[in-house]
Amino acid sequence: METEGWPALQPLLCLAWIATTLPIIVAALPIPAAAGGHLLRRLLSAFSSRGKTVRPSPASSSGSSSSKAKFTVPQKYFMHFYVVGVLATTILLLAIWFYAYMKMTPLLPESSSYSTIASHLVGSNSFSFGRVHSRTMGHKYHVWRTVFVLLLMEIQVLRRLYETEHVFHYSPSARMHIVGYLTGLFYYVAAPLSLASSCIPEAAEYLQGQVAEFIVKGRARMPDLVIDSSSLLQPLLKLGWTQWIGAVIFIWGSLHQIRCHAILGTLREHKDSDEYVIPCGDWFNRVSCPHYLAELVIYFGMLVASGGEDIPVWFLFVFVITNLSFAAVETHKWYLQKFEDYPRSRYAIIPFVC
């Protein structure tokens, strides 16, 4: 449902995802060096590097190291991603949840069955009533489904914010490229926008109307707002099986990511140490970057829970796959170069694929 002032939101999001995904796909293709393939891969590798993969080697000159440092930021700035993600997701979640509560409840009105019977008794308008009723109910489900998916996203960014502060111990020398940093900030704004893109226009219009009414009438003339907790939560429990399958996939991926992050967090007991060891346990026994694999599972769960009806959600998922796969391959190469005894049976991110 498009609303004046917001008609281009979904196309803009799709274009933004294409612009960020396409260079990664092109860099992964076997383009000859003469055609610029090697240069593009080196640029993308530099932009996506962080932590151990961005640290200059001891053999590099001090001038080269200082030059590289100009285009990097501390890896502990990862926290900025999740602060931005929490803010963006929370604002959208509260706005759309409020809109759904005020305009999209009850999800299944008790009178609907009686109205349908009456329409059949009347006869002439039964089919048109059924079509309108079906569209209305379908739209209500869509809005509440968006609330459900935003709740999953909120859980994800809140957990990642906690882990960044309390689980990971970034080395003082760990850096990430400024382009990767800006891409991360973009991602944690665009991701919740994509998950809610189809509902944002109407929710924004409703909230604007409420604010305008408040300004004109004043608080004394506005009706009292009474929040019924059952009406706030009950529609979420009446969503379809697709949402709950998506939630189960999301939880499965989250549990494995929690374990893998805990393993990574304990590799360096001393925060000032730069020493790296081979991680083992959980999905690390299969792939080099199981926390990335878990991220793919998490966002696949969100895609399933969303119903897959909105194109920006698909573009978001494609970006997650390409971005994390590219980064995982670079990390896998680093492990193989760093450790002579690194298990050759491990894949980069997806078992039996890459």
Curated annotation (Swiss-Prot):
Top enzyme category: oxidoreductase
Cited InterPro entries: 3-oxo-5_a-steroid_4-DH_C, Dfg10/SRD5A3
Annotated S-S bridges: none
Pathway it works in: Protein modification; protein glycosylation
One GO term (biological process): dolichol biosynthetic process
Protein name: Polyprenal reductase 1
Pfam families assigned: Steroid_dh
Lineage of source species: Eukaryota, Viridiplantae, Streptophyta, Embryophyta, Tracheophyta
Keyword Metal-binding: no
Function: Plays a key role in early steps of protein N-linked glycosylation by being involved in the conversion of polyprenol into dolichol. Acts as a polyprenal reductase that mediates the reduction of polyprenal into dolichal in a NADP-dependent mechanism. Dolichols are required for the synthesis of dolichol-linked monosaccharides and the oligosaccharide precursor used for N-glycosylation.
Membrane topology: Multi-pass membrane protein
Chief location: membrane
Catalysed reactions, as listed in the record: a di-trans,poly-cis-dolichal + NADP(+) = a di-trans,poly-cis-polyprenal + NADPH + H(+)
Subcellular compartments: Cell membrane
GO molecular function: 3-oxo-5-alpha-steroid 4-dehydrogenase activity; polyprenal reductase activity
Keyword field: Cell membrane, Membrane, NADP, Oxidoreductase, Transmembrane, Transmembrane helix
Keyword Nucleotide-binding: no
Residues that span the membrane, as ranges: 11-31, 78-98, 141-158, 176-196, 235-255, 301-321
